[in-house]
Amino acid sequence: MDKRTEMVAGASRIFDLEGFRGVGIDRVIEPSGVSTRTLYKHFGSRDGLVLAVIEARHARFMQQLTLESGTDDPIGSLFDTLHEWVAEHGARGCMLLRARSEYASACEAVVTLVQQQKQEFLREVSRRVDLALGRGDEALALQIWLLFEGATASASVASITVINEAKRAALLLLQLAGDNVA
């Protein structure tokens, strides 16, 4: 693993567990054992590192979705992937939204990147709705996206089983949309 990748991985763990803005730079670089100078050489700033971390996190999640995209249940598998992700990484809500919240007035680049990533995920949900129904349904895609985002947040304050309930609701909405084809 190269230094840049190592710094992103180490900072990702720290940011995920301890937050973004309230953690000192020495703590952020501690897992990779690099100097502050090395951090600035690779990322230009702390915000540059934050951007790299949320880019990597989003890419990993989207890759995880791609790995299971061959399933015959394109909507249910979204929630199965979320369940696996939360079981592996912990239920702390969406790291991207936490970054956006902490940087809302401090770094427009973080806010913009998270918005773009959420739109990319909504497009993926929409693509899966198209696969499941054989036609587009943007309202249904938005509803399923909201269930997914809500389950991600709710799992952090309730039980991971809320993901299963969100899956059931999404599949019911999908069934209703399929039944209402004229």
Name each model feature, range by range.
Residues E6, G10-G48, A52:
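Helix-turn-helix
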Residues G10-I14, W85, E124:
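Short amphipathic alpha-helical elements of helix-turn-helix/winged-helix folds
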Residues G48, S77, T81, M95-R98, ...:
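Amphipathic alpha-helical interaction segments
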Residues A52, Q63-R92, A141-I144:
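Hydrophobic alpha-helical connector segments
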Residues E55-F61:
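Short, basic, alpha-helical segments at the C-terminal edge of helix-turn-helix-like DNA-binding modules
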Residues M62, L67, D73-G76, A106-A132, ...:
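Amphipathic alpha-helical packing segments from all-alpha helical-bundle domains
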Residues E88-T112:
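Amphipathic alpha-helical segments used for helix-helix packing
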Residues A109-Q116, L131-A182:
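Hydrophobic/aromatic-rich alpha-helical bundle segments in the mid-to-C-terminal region
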